[in-house]
Regions:
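Short glycine-rich or small-residue beta-strand-to-loop segments that form or flank ligand, phosphate
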Residues: 4-11, 42, 49-57, 126-128
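N-terminal, positively charged regions that mediate nucleic acid binding
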Residues: 1-38
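Residues forming anionic-ligand binding surfaces in small-molecule and nucleic-acid pockets
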Residues: 4, 113-131
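Glycine-rich, N-terminal phosphate-binding loop and its surrounding beta-alpha-beta segment
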Residues: 39-42, 48-106
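Conserved small/polar residues in nucleotide/adenosyl-binding loops
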Residues: 149-156
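Generic secondary-structure signature for well-ordered alpha-helical cores
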Residues: 27-35, 73, 77, 127, ...
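Structural signature of FAD isoalloxazine-binding scaffolds in flavoprotein oxidoreductases
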Residues: 136-143
Length: 160
């Protein structure tokens, strides 16, 4: 039986990547000020709106709204005509303190009994289809994405 197999690669402006970059920027800020911060941050975005949720434990406060706006603008969403930009989008922060149950699971002196809280680990596989051991469809998708990201960034193709 024949089947079709495909892979996807998205650039920095894709909504999933925007959400990941916002979460990453927030985590980086927490860790810059308190290396023992515990962060579980989820970000969702849509037309004109960003929702940030999760559990945090840190000795420091960070300005979630400013970091979020700066990240969106750095990605390139800077014009209201995009219907999503860092200057005017709504930002809802539903961050709260890490639960005591998770705290007990992740704060242990014995590293072998250390828990991961509610965080999971995703993994893939290596194959010999390409030099970097990635499936050829994914490797090609990444190459195309890198190429058109370069064309957009250098304004070679202004419509991108």
């Amino acid at each position: 039986m024949a089947y079709l197999f495909s892979s996807e690669s998205v650039s920095e402006g894709h909504p999933d990547k925007v959400a990941d970059q916002i979460s990453d920027a927030l985590l980086d800020q927490f860790l810059a000020y308190d290396e023992n911060s515990r962060c579980a941050i989820e970000t969702f975005n849509t037309t004109g709106q960003v929702v940030i949720m999760g559990e945090i434990r840190s000795k420091e406060y960070i300005d979630i709204s400013t970091i979020t706006r700066n990240t969106i603008n750095a990605i390139g969403y800077t014009k209201a005509e995009y219907q999503f930009d860092g200057n005017s989008c709504g930002i809802l922060s539903a961050i709260h303190e890490q639960s005591s149950d998770i705290r007990r699971g992740v704060d242990r002196n014995d590293a072998e009994n250390q828990g991961a809280g509610d965080q999971g680990m995703m993994f893939g596989y290596a194959c010999n289809e390409t030099e970097n051991y990635m499936p050829v469809t994914l490797d090609l998708a990444h190459l195309i994405t890198v190429s058109y990201t370069h064309l957009r960034a250098h304004e070679t193709l202004r419509y991108l």
